[in-house]
Amino acid sequence: PLHDIRLDERLFSNPVYNTWIELTFHQTQEGVLQYARAVLENGLPPGVLMIDDGWSDSYGRWHFSREKFYDPEGMLSELHRLGFTVMLWICPFITPDTQEYRELEQTGLLVTDRDGKSYISHWWNGWSAVLDMTQPAACSWLKRQLDGLQAMGVDGFKFDAGDSVYYPADSVVTGDTHSKAWAAFGERYPLNEFRVTNGAGGWSLMQRLSDK
């Protein structure tokens, strides 16, 4: 069914830029600002700027890496001054052997296999646990992380991964259900972007057709 479309008009009124091709995993404060200024210096208008994977120290620890971003608040303020709307890349994965992983495993908020063991998914960036977005408590946990980022000045989020194939085939809950739950969480943000969704036609989501 068609959902109430609440997408931010800025996703369509101006270009959407992404730092991935320029910086890949080497996202830094200097690199992001240099990229944004180069956009303007080359006669292009400001628009939505997505800071891609590599801005945090690990997956699930959704805080700016202080080694790469020594003053994230100042960077966000400068990007806004230049006319950009800023989105951050996130994913449902949790890096194993981190404080976040141990906390989420102890509280039962990670995806498990049929035997009840925390599932470790093999995805394009290696091996990670997966946040169980079918649980309201897991959604609340992630929302708190994103609330903190928005309080700093982040405007929205690029919700990557969430593909059905990255969830266990022997889980009680199907991969399609998990993928749809990831999309449902992201839909609450008017500034969202997805690479892939499942069963979310007519939802208030921006999904790209392909990488360019």
Residue ranges of each PLM-predicted region?
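Catalytic-domain carbohydrate-binding cleft regions of carbohydrate-active enzymes
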Residues: 1-212
